[in-house]
């Protein structure tokens, strides 16, 4: 193991004595770093080094020479200490009570105030004396000036008098200018000037209230809104004006219609008057002519009705488009190519039912007649589009095939039992519709056979 050696360490105590005390401390000798003794020795050395304080080090170290600044500081500190000691040694005067000190201060202030007032009075007296002396001086100077001015004026007047006496009168009386005669204004000129001035005044007056009215209208509208709380009053006024206009237009139309009178009534009137039969006949003929002319004028004013298409064109249309249906019919019908075309039969409910019931004449109002040309264009466009569709799909017809071939007749319309009336816009005959409906399946059968 490790051997122990006795080592002596010197420590300086914190006391003022210069003697150094020694202590004997046993420190183990460390042989290798791996042993625990090595760390123990290290810790002991650290402890010994920490035991020395700053004071002991300063005492042992030699003192350096002082600088001049340090010497001055030392001198100043010494002088201050001496002054303090002297003050402490001197006997202190007893302090007066606070009340007495206050009274003394007040009396001193009063004395000072009194002295100041006396000084102010003296200054005021001196100022007044100076002002009086200045006024007296100014009066004397004014009097002197006035006397000098009077003397000068007198001298000037004397000179003027001497000149007048010596110099003759050279100035002659000049003839006065004759006053030009004023132009006499005629009555027309006066009226023109008055009218122009009046017109300008009127314009100015009219312009001013216009500007005020613009502002006043806005103010009135705002006031009305505040009073009523709603804008209903303003809207009703506009509505009433529009209705009045419409009623006036209607009354004018009624008056035009009521102007016509029947010829029979006119004949009776003529006979009542007691005129001859010839005169009555002539009067009735004239009135008839007038009525005819009026009717012609009305017809010219009205828009011309749409020209009717011929029945042949309609037949071509229906033959090309046998699948055109109304709103009530079923449009989605799928053709079947499984069975031969001999067993297929088509029945159009519209064509069958129209033969049983009589025709119904539908009188269209004037508004529909006006719309006729617009509808015509739409129909033409539809027909052209339908024809192109039928060219592409030739098999899409209203036909149904019977698989057993025992019941050849089948209906495609769900509402076939209900009687339906067809009203064509172009007044096409129903017979042509029937023919086209019957001819369509025959054509299809021929096509299927050829295939």
Curated annotation (Swiss-Prot):
Composition-biased stretches (Acidic residues): 114-147
Region spans: Disordered: 1-451
Bias type Polar residues, positions: 44-54
Basic and acidic residues bias (residue ranges): 73-99, 163-192, 199-210, 217-230, 284-303, 311-340, 356-383, 441-451
Domain of life the protein comes from: Eukaryota
Biased composition (Low complexity): 9-22, 232-244, 341-355, 393-425
Skewed-composition ranges (Basic residues): 152-162
Protein name listed in UniProt: Uncharacterized protein DDB_G0286299
Native species: Dictyostelium discoideum (Social amoeba)
Organism placement in taxonomy: Eukaryota, Amoebozoa, Evosea, Eumycetozoa, Dictyostelia
